[in-house]
Amino acid sequence: MTMNQAKPPARADQAAGQQQPLLKLSGIEKKFVNPLDLAGRIANLLGAGNRATVVHAVDGVDLEVQAGEVIGIVGESGCGKSTLGRVVAGINPPTAGHVSYQGQDTRTMTAAQRKAYELGVQMIFQNPMASLNPRMRVVDIIGEAPVVHGLVKAADKATYVADLMRQVGLDPEYAQRYPHQFSGGQRQRIGIARALALKPRVIVCDEAVAALDVSIQAQVLNLFTQLREQHDLTYLSVSYTHLTLPTIYSV
């Protein structure tokens, strides 16, 4: 697994000294324990000596991410890059080490700091169909969370969702449709809009274009670049090849 980094243009407020990292990973490790099944436990009663299998997915990762940067994590399948992305997004807690967001250790955050972290770091998944609730309409997929978290009033949800759909290149008239009524590229745009809906500062892209046709990949990568400029986003982009990163890397 390798990491590439694109830095944002220097800003006036950085002249006085080094800016505090927006996101910092310190000694991150993640292990998954596969417990023995029933047959293995029975065999142990007979003296077999079987043990649970431990998968060491991530081992000792240190990383600092400044606001506005784009970090590319590239590696072969199974190297732990997606697991690292999930740790950053708070989906999987690390086995060892810690994540800091805006200078605050996530292990000791107050409730308000925890909410800012959970809303401020969003994730876009590789398989758009699997990551969208098939029983929910697009207007609710995108608009439910910002209403629940008080970012938008319920009465303004439809307007808010329509604006987000336009930003990602979707017709707002499709807001009442279900995920299965869209193409793969359109479903991924829904996933992008859902992430944007919570007004994040960091977006983790977990092979976000890997499941799309090559022509659609280019369109979605260009969209990421546009959204980065519009919303001052920071990206942590996971991919099995650097070929899906160049468009994002323009600074």
Question: For the regions a protein language model found, what residue spans apply to each?
Answer:
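Single conserved hydrophobic/aromatic residue that forms the stacking wall/gate
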Residues: 242-251
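Conserved ABC transporter NBD signature motif
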Residues: 97-105
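Conserved ABC ATPase "signature" region
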Residues: 40-47, 105, 156-173
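ABC ATPase NBD coupling module
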Residues: 49-52, 93, 106-122, 140, ...
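Helix-to-loop junction immediately C-terminal to a conserved catalytic motif
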Residues: 89
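A short, proline-enriched helix->beta-strand linker immediately N-terminal to the Walker B motif
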Residues: 197-201, 217
